[in-house]
Structures are given as structure tokens and as C-alpha cells.
Amino acid sequence: MEQIILSRKDSITITKSLVTDILLLGVIYMLPTISHLLAFPLYLLDPMRVVIFASILLSASRLNSFILATTIPLFSFFVGGHPVFVKSLLIALELLANLALFWFFYKKGVNVFVTTFISIILSKVLYYILKASLLDAGLLKMELVSTSLIIQALVAVAISLLMALFMKNNLTNTELG
């Protein structure tokens, strides 16, 4: 029977990824409480998307970002009951598409700001197409657009600026992946 032996470097990388994931999940888990204490609806700032982009900056593994994109909405549903399960799946798909598009454009050498912004916008277009389909099918009962498109655009610009700033000034492990 073969035994898998991890190198010290692999063990450290895995440990860092786990610690990063736990911290990021903790932030997401605490958002409703923080939002209540601040009397400000933090969901307007697109915290799940912020977390997946933070994971790009903080994690040594692209796979880690994809795992977070898949699990954060489901974690939120199972722990807090919000958003509803179908919408949680929809958000997970949107975040996965966002990451896939980000890496696609990034590998093509597109400017980080443009890469981030376009990947957010295209993943939101996918989200709204799928959400409209789910609304038409009666699988969701809510408004198509619950957060102002202007606020969403401003948040997309802010995330894009931050990504451009941090990736320019702090060459991260994303360059390795």
C-alpha cells in the first residue's frame, strides 16, 4: 500500500489554506451579527464576492477559492437559513463563474481592474438570467433585482480597484498557480 507523504512545504500550504478558509468563513458567519450591530445592511457590499476575491489574494491555491465559492453560500444557508437553498445554489454558481472568468481573463494578460470588473459583470448577467428562469419556473419567490443595480456597479468598481491595487503592490501566490 502506497503512503502519501507531504513535504513540509505542502503541509504549510495546506495549513495556511485551512486557516484562511476558517477565518473567511468566520467573517461570513458573523456578518448578520455585525450587520445588526452596525444597523447597516452589509449584504449591499457583496460580502461573499469580497471573500472569494480576498481568497485569491490570501491563498496559495486557486482550488481553495473555488471551494470557498461553492461552500460559502451553502454554509450561509445551513447555518443561518439565508438565502433560501435554491438561491444559495444560484449564488454559488455565480461565484464559480466569477472565478472562472477572472482566471480566464487574467491568464490572457488582461489588466487586473478590467479582469475583475468584467468577470463580476458577466457573472452577474449569468446570475440574473438564471434567477429570471427560476422565478418564471416558480422555484423562487422574490424580486428579480433586490439590490440596486447602481449599488452593485459601484461595489464591482470598488472590488476591481482593490484587486488592481493589491495585486499590483503585493504580488501574491496567484502568480504561481
PLM feature segments, named:
Residues M30, A69, P73, F77, ...:
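Hydrophobic alpha-helical segments of integral membrane proteins
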Residues V50-A54, F77, L95-L99, K124-Y128, ...:
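Hydrophobic transmembrane alpha-helices of multi-pass small-molecule transporters
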Residues E2-L57, L63-N64:
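Hydrophobic transmembrane alpha-helices
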Residues A60-S61, N111:
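A helix-boundary/kink motif common to multi-pass secondary transporters
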Residues Y29-L45, I72-F102, K131-D136, L144:
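Interfacial aromatic-anchored transmembrane helix boundaries in multi-pass membrane proteins
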Residues R62-T70:
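Transmembrane-helix signature of polytopic, membrane-embedded enzymes
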Residues E2-V27, L68, L89-A132, A164:
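Short helix-perturbing small/polar motifs within transmembrane alpha-helices
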Residues F85-L89, F105-G177:
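Membrane-embedded alpha-helical hairpins and interfacial helices in multi-pass inner-membrane proteins
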